[in-house]
UniProtKB/Swiss-Prot annotation:
Gene that encodes it: TDC2
Protein name (database record): Tryptophan decarboxylase TDC2
GO molecular function, one term: L-tryptophan decarboxylase activity
Inducing factors: Induced by methyl jasmonate.
InterPro entries in the cross-refs: Aromatic_deC, PyrdxlP-dep_de-COase, PyrdxlP-dep_Trfase, PyrdxlP-dep_Trfase_major, PyrdxlP-dep_Trfase_small, Pyridoxal-P_BS
Residues with N6-(pyridoxal phosphate)lysine modification: K316
Plastid keyword on record: no
Keywords: Decarboxylase, Lyase, Pyridoxal phosphate
């Protein structure tokens, strides 16, 4: 049990005003200056943090301060202790993973979200929050030219989740419960789900959380000749084998723009198979979906009208800050039936009238933030035209990098570029042992990242180790791409001459 602190200072405690408007105004101005200076000087920091594991614990006290500390002292410690341990995702020299894009518009939208601190679990708790989210989800659906079956103006609807993981989990639970109504809960062990060996790793995690047995997760092999896209014929064979074995096909997750190489699963032929067997057909377009607001890329979503759900993450490419994943479903009632809660303390007339949407029933948790403000500010501040230009600019810079790679015979493009990701490797001796080539590229990756000037990552697909160069950080310009290529070539020179 605890004990009363005999040194408790009631006078000092009584002076604490956690939200005094003028003090907030002063500190907020200081923080905005701090953030603006950080963005302005971000290139002065190593892109990839150079600290060792456990570095921070030795720098900070073992216990929280008993007395308040000046705001200026806290900011000073951010400079001294926190920034050295930050990998700078907003650096224009960050070419790793996929980008987490930002903008001034999204930032001020986030400020308002934090300002209101509304917990919009149902309509009554925050009417504007719920209704604005419905509006921006329909706006984005229109930008993507989704059918009305996915919009609130039509028969479907959309909700902002935190990440793709949550979007997949929610739709998987909805599909599971719908199936179990027919076959009985005791048959959950018969449910089988499908994806490719390029489907994001979060899929398996969501399946485990939804009670799908690991042995019932089908990860269908893809081939380099098909650019690692999921084969409808292979899917059909897997399903046929499962049906013959008495299993129950449940769910298919296709991907438009896989994480490793941006492979694109062709939706229409996959929909043929999924619809024939009554699978819930989900499309994960977390990264590449945003590009489909550009007419020249929209065809990658052809067939989406035959899917049950679609998710994409504006925080990756639509300047919207983390976290923001948009999920659309054709039949919201199926999702709501699986995820709804109705405790007495949340009962209210608008909800009971069925005239409003309660987003708590569209997600795993109950509480939710006013994330729609970020998208609303971004869409209104930049307009569709500028968002399209932003995406096209990133893709053009990736094309430029691709041309650099093709101009040096020591390097090769491993997988055809589609969007703003270039998958390449150093392969100066085309007939050399693959193990030696992999080791050489591992060394090149380590050399480049150790400089702190650039950060890139790798993947391994079809047994081939390759480097990933993902253009997309908000501040990246052509000269950053040129400088990154120059550094990569220097690394290759150093390794090949050693």
């Amino acid at each position: 049990m605890g004990s009363i602190d005999s040194n408790y200072d009631t006078e000092s405690a009584g002076q604490c005003r956690p939200l005094e408007p003028e003090e907030f105004r002063k500190q907020a101005h200081q923080m905005v200056d701090f953030i603006a200076d950080y963005y302005k000087n971000i290139e002065s920091y190593p892109v990839l943090s150079q600290v060792e594991p456990g570095y921070l614990q030795s720098r900070l006290p073992e216990t929280a301060p008993y007395r308040p500390e000046p705001f200026e002292s806290i900011l000073k410690d951010v400079h001294k202790d926190i920034i050295p341990g930050v990998t700078h995702w907003l650096s224009p020299n960050f070419f790793a993973y996929f980008p987490a894009t930002v903008s001034s518009a999204a930032f001020v939208g986030e400020m308002l979200c934090t300002c209101f601190n509304a917990v919009g679990f149902n309509w009554l708790a925050s009417p504007a929050e719920l209704e604005l989210e419905m509006v921006v989800m329909d706006w984005l659906a229109s930008m993507l030219k989704l059918p009305n079956s996915f919009t609130f103006l039509g028969t479907g609807g959309g909700v902002i989740q935190g990440t793709t993981s949550e979007a997949i989990l929610c739709t998987l639970i909805a599909a599971r419960d719908r199936a179990l109504e027919s076959i009985g809960v005791d048959s959950i062990h018969k449910l089988v789900v499908y994806g490719s060996d390029q489907t994001h790793s979060t899929y398996a995690k969501a399946c485990n959380l939804a009670g799908i047995l690991p042995c019932n997760i089908r990860s269908i092999r893809t081939e380099a000749v098909a650019n690692f896209s999921l084969s409808p014929d292979s899917l059909h064979r897997e399903i046929e084998a499962d049906v013959a074995a008495g299993m129950v096909p449940l769910y298919l997750c296709a991907t438009v723009g896989t994480t490793s190489t941006t492979a694109i699963d062709s939706l229409s032929p996959l929909a043929d198979v999924a619809n024939d067997y009554g699978l819930w057909f989900h499309v994960d377009a977390a990264y590449a979906g945003s590009a489909c607001i550009c007419p020249e890329f929209r065809h990658y979503l052809d067939g989406i009208e035959r899917a049950d759900s679609l998710s994409l993450s504006p925080h990756k490419w639509l300047l919207s800050y983390l976290d923001c994943c948009c999920l659309w479903v054709k039949r919201p009632s199926v999702l709501v039936k699986a995820l709804s809660t109705d405790p007495e303390y949340l009962k209210n007339k608008p909800s009971e009238s069925n005239s409003v949407v309660d987003f708590k029933d569209w997600q795993v948790g109950t509480g939710r933030r006013f994330k729609a403000l970020r998208l609303w500010f971004v869409m209104r501040s930049y307009g569709v035209a500028n968002l399209q230009s932003h995406i096209r600019s990133d893709i053009q810079m990736a094309k430029m990098f691709e041309e650099f790679v093709n101009s040096d015979p020591r390097f090769e493009i491993v997988v055809p570029r589609v969007f703003s990701l270039v998958c390449f490797r150093l392969n100066p001796f085309s007939k050399s042992d693959p193990c030696n080539t992999e080791l050489l590229n591992r060394k090149l990756l380590e050399w480049v990242n150790s400089t702190g000037q650039v950060y890139i990552t790798h993947t391994k697909v079809g047994g081939v180790y390759m480097l990933r160069f993902a253009v997309g950080a908000t501040l990246t310009e052509e000269h950053h791409v040129s400088a990154a290529w120059k550094l990569i070539r220097e690394g290759a020179d150093a390794l090949l001459c050693s």
